[in-house]
């Protein structure tokens, strides 16, 4: 068939008519929020999926009109044009392979995701091959009776599909290559693990220890390689485009109900709120979100009903599997939110193998550049603001050279703030600060929310940032302004290495003295591993301001004099009551910390009482207290059958959450002065305000135009689909992104115990509980499950004691003696912990190791000359409940140990003197080496002189003793038998020995199983009879004989078990014989 010629005027007319069908004459207000309406009549037919007949889309104008009309007729409110879906928080996600190498690889999960990904890619390839065949046959039919223009367009589409298919094939080859490399590293790691077990079981010699160290190094290397391959494979998973279709529930959703849906996928988050309208319509403030697929994480969905000012009712929370979403066709997913399934969340999920932004044509770059030049020309025509105190000579703008580096959010924020402050010189105008143009605002509107929620800066490696709000000192009798000083504090540096102040800085100080006022200096820098922090103090006689600089190898980019702002000396006395507040960028949301610290400053310890651990304690907490509690509750809810220990833990965690929420509500009822201080502090960040702006705020110097150009380029790069005014006022954005604020639908303030050091300790123990539950659900023997449940019960008791003793009284959790009275009864151990931590609730592992080395290494060297520090590391690892292999893969400066772990260890081992305990442990290590050396005379000598009460005992020692029961020397076997038989009367030793030997029965090495069987026989461990019965059917004749002999030594219970074991096979043999005869006779 022939297609009519369509001119450019006809196309413009058609586009105008289509736009009039979709939008009214007045258009859509640029300030209207992004609303998506979901009704019962879905567009595109019963499936709700619209797909064109070809890759580029051969849909007619009537079809497009009908689809638009059917969709818009279902909307309850006006809509703006559908914008590009925004991506959630991507800080730290898929940034580099170094971030992925720190996590533990998950081979089974990688295998599952790889199979699903490969199937999805093959399905994509088949779909496009079918599309290509269809277009190719269509082109052959149209060659004779069609115009050249139509054939040209069709040929372009065919070539586009062919290029896409070649890209898919290359993508598949990369996926296969990465997975093959992952499998190779997995097999190498499994081999290293088996070698480690072999060297561990062999006699300890110098060569064995060196080989074991090499195997451990290889094991760590293979593990890191697996994590690297896993991270690279994760980067090739594409994108999930999730569209909100609304909630569904018969007689459950009523008009006027408001709901909040929170989706969490690893570090990516999507929060949207909606309202149930009349006529089965719903309005939501979000339509579509892009999630980057992850390998190890699942999608957590939580639906909350908003009933009042601060009353939120949890409707339900579910965890969704993601490997089934790798399909070529979009899927409509109905998620049962509650247990009964009366409320369902309808989502449309589409998977794209590549980033959609990568598929744009090259012509798009020309249009972007044209739009960029047009916006720059428009914004440069405005009238600049009237400058304030512009006649001051040292207030001049000097454009900085960025040396080809792309600016981050923090650099952009810093430059905009400094330029505004330069012209205003009034801290009172800080609340009105905002970026300079509409194009500048698009940078903030399209930024990942993780910038506000997790404090990320969008780069792979970030140095620690710390914002300090302190009082500004002045000698004037007039009170200083209530706005606190904002300073970025770097890690401590040597004061002697600080450069002297420049002449311009001295002018700043002199001017500050003349005006008799405080100052503020702000310096925020991009994080770069090649850059180092340096500190320049510019402190006048009557001011206490500190200017910071970023020092590189060749130049010093210091805070210029234009960065200094003078405060007006007309404020209230309430500022004098504020205490310095330390905030850390690595902890998470800076605004969340700000509100928590300002609202609970009366309960914090004095600054003078805090050591370095107190100042930096928040850097150790990767997640907030609320996030860890919710994560643990979600994991507990995901378990089907829960035993008593898990139920008790869940009840205690929920009780803890309720107590902390009560504390937050109590904080809300504080005096109005502090509330106004918090509100004022939040308003100080309104320079991020994107709800309104000044079109004529264009600046008056050369630096302004360059920054406007950068904002436009950055906006185009990050995507201009989202409207720059969609975020609204910063207070609204903070309420939505961080859960703080005082809006009607806002979430409560962050949960806290009132002491940030105690917060960190509680978070570590909650994360430990989460880890134990993960181990519990990952398989293992029955004895291992019993051990995990016992540890969970211990953590439950700890949380219960903390809740009853501390959280119900505001002033009861400020020091260790208040929280752990039992530790005060041991003065020497209390002093040891205070020296390691400064009296706080946690400290770093590196500090503990160094202090214990200085205190006890000299005495240990006399007992264990070759490795005295190994005993100290052994004790600390047991405090933290981790293996030596895991401890060697992390840095001691990053690991944290809590006072509760320290106290649990000394209670379990009944320690009153740590030095004596270490000496006994060193002697036990020497005993283990003597028993494993293979010298019968030395082994006999050590067995005769060792005291059972002095042994801890360690698993390695117990296995070394059991190994002597399988030697060929009868004298050694008799001495070992007598030793274990006498040790059976010592209950602590017997309990640990039975657990150790029972666990050893499930190992793969025959030598270890034989020795453990013989040791259980000596201990008369009847409680291990089930594990011994399993070995009676072993293929190995010697092991089977030892298991039977051990079973017969267990008295009456063992004899009955052996008789049952002996009769069952005979009955089965007789039954099989009768059946065989019957079959033979019939034929």
Swiss-Prot record:
Top-level taxon of the source organism: Eukaryota
Annotated InterPro entries: ARM-like, ARM-type_fold, FAM65_N, RIPOR3
Record keywords, A-Z: Cell adhesion, Cell membrane, Cell projection, Chemotaxis, Coiled coil, Cytoplasm, Cytoskeleton, Differentiation, Hearing, Membrane, Myogenesis, Signal transduction inhibitor
Claim: Transport is one of the keywords in the record: no
Compositional bias annotation for Basic residues: 81-92
UniProt-annotated location(s): Cytoplasm; Cytoplasm, Cytoskeleton; Cell projection, Filopodium; Apical cell membrane
One Pfam family, short name: PL48
Principal subcellular localisation of the protein: cytoplasm
GO MF entry, a single one: 14-3-3 protein binding
Region (Disordered): 21-48, 71-111, 471-508
Gene3D superfamilies per record: Leucine-rich Repeat Variant
Entry keyword Zinc-finger: no
Function: Acts as an inhibitor of the small GTPase RHOA and plays several roles in the regulation of myoblast and hair cell differentiation, lymphocyte T proliferation and neutrophil polarization. Plays a role in fetal mononuclear myoblast differentiation by promoting filopodia and myotube formation. Maintains naive T lymphocytes in a quiescent state and prevents chemokine-induced T lymphocyte responses, such as cell adhesion, polarization and migration. Involved also in the regulation of neutrophil polarization, chemotaxis and adhesion.
Family statement: Belongs to the RIPOR family.
Subunit structure, interactors included: Homooligomer; homooligomerization is regulated by RHOC and leads to the formation of concatemers through the association of N- and C-termini.
Protein known as: Rho family-interacting cell polarization regulator 2
Organism: Danio rerio
């Amino acid at each position: 068939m022939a297609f009519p010629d369509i001119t450019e005027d006809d196309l413009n007319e058609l586009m105008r008519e289509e736009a009039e069908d979709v939008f009214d004459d007045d258009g859509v207000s640029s300030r209207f929020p992004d609303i998506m309406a979901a009704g019962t009549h879905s567009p595109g037919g019963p499936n709700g999926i619209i797909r064109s007949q070809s890759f580029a889309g051969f849909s007619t104008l009537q079809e497009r009109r009908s689809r638009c009309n059917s969709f818009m007729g279902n909307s309850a409110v006006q809509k703006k044009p559908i914008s590009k879906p925004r991506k959630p928080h991507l800080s730290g996600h898929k940034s580099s392979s170094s971030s992925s190498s720190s996590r533990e690889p998950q081979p089974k999960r990688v295998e599952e995701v790889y199979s699903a990904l490969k199937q999805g890619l093959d399905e994509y390839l088949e779909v496009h091959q079918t599309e290509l065949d269809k277009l190719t046959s269509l082109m052959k039919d149209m060659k004779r009776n069609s115009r050249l223009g139509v054939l040209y367009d069709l040929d372009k589409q065919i070539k586009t599909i062919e290029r896409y298919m070649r890209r898919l094939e290359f993508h598949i080859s990369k996926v296969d290559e990465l997975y093959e490399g992952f499998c190779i590293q997995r097999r190498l790691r499994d081999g290293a693990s088996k070698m480690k077990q072999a060297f561990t079981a062999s006699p300890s010699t110098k060569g064995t220890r060196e080989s074991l160290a090499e195997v451990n190094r290889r094991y760590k290397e293979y593990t890191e390689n697996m994590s690297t391959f896993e991270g690279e494979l994760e980067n090739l998973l594409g994108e999930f485009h999730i569209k909100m279709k609304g909630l569904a529930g018969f007689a459950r959703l009523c008009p006027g109900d408001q709901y909040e849906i929170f989706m969490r996928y690893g570090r990516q988050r999507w929060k949207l709120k909606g309202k149930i309208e009349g006529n089965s319509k719903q309005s939501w403030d979000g339509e579509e979100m892009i999630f980057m697929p992850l390998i190890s994480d699942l999608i957590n969905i939580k639906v909350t009903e908003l009933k009042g000012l601060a009353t939120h009712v949890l409707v339900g929370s579910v965890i969704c599997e993601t490997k089934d979403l790798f399909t070529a066709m979009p899927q409509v997913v109905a998620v049962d939110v509650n247990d009964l399934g009366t409320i369902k969340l309808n989502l449309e999920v589409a998977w794209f193998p590549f980033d959609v932004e990568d598929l744009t044509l090259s012509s798009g770059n020309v249009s972007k550049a044209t739009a960029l030049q047009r916006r720059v020309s428009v914004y440069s025509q405005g009238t600049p603001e009237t400058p304030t105190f512009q006649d001051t000579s040292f207030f001049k703008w000097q454009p900085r050279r960025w040396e080809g580096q792309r600016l981050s959010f923090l650099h952009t924020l810093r430059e905009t703030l400094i330029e505004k402050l330069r012209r205003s010189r009034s801290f009172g105008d800080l609340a009105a600060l905002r970026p300079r143009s509409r194009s500048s605002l698009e940078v903030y509107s399209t930024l990942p929310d993780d910038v506000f929620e997790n404090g990320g800066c969008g780069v792979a490696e970030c140095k620690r940032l710390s914002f300090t709000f302190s009082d500004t000192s002045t000698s004037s009798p007039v009170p200083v302004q209530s706005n606190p000083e904002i300073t970025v504090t770097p890690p401590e540096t040597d004061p002697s290495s600080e450069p002297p102040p420049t002449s311009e800085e001295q002018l700043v100080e002199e001017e500050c003295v003349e005006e008799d006022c405080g100052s503020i200096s702000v310096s925020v820098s991009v994080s770069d591993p090649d850059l180092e922090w340096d500190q320049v103090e510019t402190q006048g006689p009557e001011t206490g301001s500190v200017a910071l600089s970023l020092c590189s190898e060749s130049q010093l980019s210091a805070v210029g004099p234009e960065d200094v702002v003078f405060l007006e000396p007309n404020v209230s006395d309430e500022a004098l009551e504020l205490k310095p507040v330390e905030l850390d960028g690595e902890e998470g949301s800076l605004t969340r910390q700000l509100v928590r610290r300002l609202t609970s400053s009366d309960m914090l310890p004095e600054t003078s009482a805090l050591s370095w651990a107190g100042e930096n304690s928040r850097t150790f907490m990767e997640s907030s207290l609320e996030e860890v509690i919710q994560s643990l509750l979600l994991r507990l809810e995901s378990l089907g059958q829960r035993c008593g220990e898990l139920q008790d833990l869940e009840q205690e965690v929920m009780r803890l959450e309720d107590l902390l929420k009560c504390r937050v509500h109590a904080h809300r009822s504080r005096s109005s002065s502090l509330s106004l201080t918090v509100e004022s502090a939040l308003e100080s960040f309104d320079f991020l305000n994107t709800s309104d702006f000044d079109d004529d705020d264009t600046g008056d110097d050369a630096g302004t135009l360059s920054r406007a150009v950068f904002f436009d380029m950055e906006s185009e790069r990050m995507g201009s689909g989202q409207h720059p005014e969609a975020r609204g006022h910063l207070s609204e954005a903070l309420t939505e992104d961080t859960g703080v604020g005082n809006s009607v639908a806002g979430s409560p303030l962050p949960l806290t115990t009132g002491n940030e050091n105690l917060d960190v300790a509680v978070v570590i123990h909650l994360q430990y509980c989460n880890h134990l539950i993960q181990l519990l659900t990952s398989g293992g023997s029955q004895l291992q499950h019993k051990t995990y449940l016992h540890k969970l019960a211990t953590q439950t008791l700890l949380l219960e004691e903390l809740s009853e003793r501390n959280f119900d009284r505001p002033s009861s959790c400020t020091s260790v003696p208040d929280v752990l009275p039992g530790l005060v009864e041991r003065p020497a151990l209390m002093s040891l912990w205070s020296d390691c931590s400064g009296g706080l609730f946690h400290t770093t592992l590196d500090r503990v190791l160094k202090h214990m080395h200085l205190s006890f290494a000299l005495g240990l060297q006399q007992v264990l000359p070759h490795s005295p520090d190994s005993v100290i590391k052994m004790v600390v690892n047991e405090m933290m409940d981790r293996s030596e292999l895991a401890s060697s893969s992390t840095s001691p400066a990053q690991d944290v140990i809590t006072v509760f772990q320290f106290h649990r260890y000394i209670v379990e081992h009944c320690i009153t003197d740590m030095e004596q305990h270490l000496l006994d442990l060193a002697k036990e290590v020497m005993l283990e080496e003597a028993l494993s050396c293979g010298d019968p005379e030395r082994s006999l000598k050590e067995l005769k002189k060792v005291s059972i009460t002095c042994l801890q005992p360690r698993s390695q020692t117990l296995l070394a003793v059991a190994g002597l029961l399988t030697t060929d020397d009868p004298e050694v076997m008799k001495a070992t038998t007598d030793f274990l038989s006498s040790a059976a009367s010592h209950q602590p030793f017997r309990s640990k020995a039975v657990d150790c030997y029972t666990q050893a029965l499930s190992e793969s090495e025959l030598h270890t199983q034989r020795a453990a069987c013989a040791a259980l026989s000596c201990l008369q461990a009847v409680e291990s009879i089930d594990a011994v019965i399993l070995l009676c059917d072993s293929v190995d004749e010697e092991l089977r004989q030892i298991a039977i002999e051990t079973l017969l030594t267990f008295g009456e219970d063992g004899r009955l078990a052996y008789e049952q074991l002996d009769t069952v096979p005979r009955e089965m043999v007789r039954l099989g014989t009768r059946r065989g005869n019957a079959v033979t006779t019939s034929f």
